[in-house]
């Protein structure tokens, strides 16, 4: 009998009942809530005269709509947009009514949902984790089965602590070898998406493995699992190991004492068996990965920084040719244009993909002693949580950014998506550490280029894309 994958083990451990239609009832251990996808769910509970089934399984924070500028210290009334203000206020009221733990807008523990749950230890190995946000796959970095859900499912989880789901296929993405200096987890996952496309992982749980993955910090693993959804997979996974356990130990929600010892022993099995069979296997050589830059309107439209934008005339497939032509037109780029000839109007370092302390350190290393280029209208750094912000300030990273000409902001989703005051104007090019570059994602007509934090900082100080390794070598010289 073949061994089991990590996904198989997590699924079986949480399968309450298998249904006649092939779906299963799955128990949910952790439910993370934010202000955008929860109001209707709470109202549904109220109309049905129900209460949350397990209050302590829920944790909430506002993130999508909150302003990241200093005036937010004035409280909810400082939120200018009426809909945004109402959503944040409604989350506060709903959590207060039902006794759900919420890190409110000006709580130091507030931040992006996918940053605050891991840093609190609320995301643990072996858990099932859901949130009304597609980038819930982030939490799979802990060996947890995590994925996004819709608003109606948010209500189901609140009411029953269960979800109906169908088991997916297993995909293994194996990345072996050593990453070159200046190449990061963000470059790995962008390279994966460039290789398999945004539909490559459809219908699969995507486990990342190999020596290059094992060498990553938890921050790096979260970055990779965060963007598994951009590769088509709802679920991203990394096996639990000593790195995972060291990160979790001592955090507020982590087990303590004897419970901790028992948990660590149980977590040792959160790996795929040596003889486990995967439906699909994808392999990459870490040593061959270069700093990546997206050039188009889909995450799969990504290239190494030393390459050129494709020429649609060279594409035989008419559908692909049309996609390239449309993307070039929207992005205001020319066929065969060098990636390094793309000039930036704005730079955004933040989002649930790249706003943790390691990300800010990497960006600060490039910004230190340099200045934001005069041609760049704005460069902002948005920590993923109040605790990340405080840590960065203890390390003096805020001073490095401010002296270089970056803006140092309060935590939130910020410029990742145009749901708050931080957004692009039409036609502006932005080097962004976020996860999506769809048309209008950062503002109507905005042109998004996905990169790592170090690459974003390098673009900020030069005004155009540059291989960050040139600046690293320059610093060392």
From Swiss-Prot:
GO biological process, one term: L-leucine biosynthetic process
Matching Pfam families: Aconitase
UniProt keyword terms in alphabetical order: 4Fe-4S, Amino-acid biosynthesis, Branched-chain amino acid biosynthesis, Iron, Iron-sulfur, Leucine biosynthesis, Lyase, Metal-binding
UniProt cross-references to CDD domains, sorted A to Z: IPMI
Enzymatic class: lyase
Gene3D superfamilies: Aconitase, domain 3 (3.30.499.10)
Cofactor(s) this protein cannot do without: [4Fe-4S] cluster
EC number: 4.2.1.33
Entry note: cofactor: Binds 1 [4Fe-4S] cluster per subunit.
Molecular function terms, GO-annotated: 3-isopropylmalate dehydratase activity; 4 iron, 4 sulfur cluster binding; metal ion binding
The reaction(s) this protein catalyses: (2R,3S)-3-isopropylmalate = (2S)-2-isopropylmalate
Positions that bind [4Fe-4S] cluster: 352, 413, 416
TM ranges: none
Pathway terms, separated by semicolons: Amino-acid biosynthesis; L-leucine biosynthesis; L-leucine from 3-methyl-2-oxobutanoate: step 2/4
PANTHER family per record: 3-ISOPROPYLMALATE DEHYDRATASE (PTHR43822:SF9), HOMOACONITASE, MITOCHONDRIAL-RELATED (PTHR43822)
Quaternary structure and partners: Heterodimer of LeuC and LeuD.
Role this protein plays: Catalyzes the isomerization between 2-isopropylmalate and 3-isopropylmalate, via the formation of 2-isopropylmaleate.
Descriptive protein name: 3-isopropylmalate dehydratase large subunit
